[in-house]
Regions:
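Fe(II)/2-oxoglutarate oxygenase catalytic core
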Residues: 1-28, 33-253, 257-290
Length: 290
């Protein structure tokens, strides 16, 4: 495979390949620029990737604003000890399977017990409905074809089980339990998937102002696997060519200090082929989520 050399961390090999393929297919530079922005890149990042000229920027009719470095946030950061093998979760020690710095990502083993996984699924089952995504225009929620799972949210500390898990997560990630959205349970039957996306709220979208009123920007995501499918359903990170295989009780955590595609946190859920995949997701916010 050809090795790509570049000194710009936001221009990943995947982006370079995509840009070359789309150019060869005959798409205009204006269309490519719009596609990058629609995929989560800030306009200034997209302009940098494409090396837009001043004339092109003016012709596209889009004002290129500087990168929002003032939006960089403090993020959850687990404290690793024992040579990066285990993390203190308060009521249990949790083993680290892998750790990466670009993006900031950790895969945990045994964050949840089998009994906890079963109890979460049993409690969630009667409350499942078609999963919603954030409506970026209004700040509300909508059904989106990119997400074909079923889901529900628990209230914060609504039961001893939920309170225990939330407390463990807070200890593990060094982040207050109040600074996170309610725990979400998702069920993916055969064929269900979630196409690659970013979890942060795009500052360029109209609905973001409303979304930020309830706790500020999202700064990290924790995905916990409650049931592993027989095949398929991996959590993928296309920008870093990583696929995390679901395993019951395990979890993958990743943070993003700014709402920018350069955080390399583009991720998705591959289609489940056989069996079912169940996950619990916790999104962490800058401040108290109400």
């Amino acid at each position: 495979m050809k090795k790509y050399q570049n000194k710009n961390p936001i221009i990943t090999p995947a982006v370079q390949i995509w840009l070359a393929e789309q150019t060869a297919a005959g798409f205009t530079r204006a269309r490519l620029f719009e596609s990058l922005c629609a995929s989560g890149w800030q306009a200034s990042e997209a302009a940098q990737i494409m090396a837009l000229t001043a004339d092109e920027r003016e012709a596209f009719g889009i004002q290129i604003r500087p990168l929002q470095t003032d939006q960089t946030s403090h993020v959850p950061q687990p404290k690793l000890i024992f040579h990066d093998v285990q993390v203190d979760g308060g009521d249990k020690w949790v083993r680290v399977l892998q750790q990466r710095s670009a993006p900031d990502l950790i895969e945990f083993e045994g964050l949840l017990s089998d009994a906890e996984c079963d109890a979460l699924m049993q409690s969630a089952q009667p409350r499942l409905s078609r999963s919603l995504t954030v409506d970026v225009q209004t700040g509300g929620h909508e059904i989106h074809p990119d997400r074909s799972s079923q889901g529900m949210f628990f209230e914060r500390a609504e039961s001893p089980l939920i309170a225990t898990i939330e407390t463990r997560i807070a200890k593990l990630l060094k982040w207050p339990a109040t600074h996170g959205e309610n725990l979400q349970i998702l069920r993916y039957p055969p064929g269900a998937q979630y196409l690659p996306h970013y979890d942060y709220f795009d500052p360029a979208q109209a609905g973001t102002v409303e979304l930020l009123k309830r706790g500020g920007q999202r700064v990290a995501t924790l995905i916990m696997y409650l049931r592993e499918p027989d095949s398929g359903g991996a959590t993928i990170f296309p920008d870093i060519d990583l696929a995390v295989t679901p395993k019951r009780g395990n979890a993958v955590f990743f943070s993003y200090a700014a709402p920018e595609a350069s955080t390399l946190t583009l991720h998705g859920g591959e289609p489940v082929i056989t069996g079912e995949k169940w996950i619990a997701t916790k999104w962490l916010r800058q401040s108290v989520f109400e």
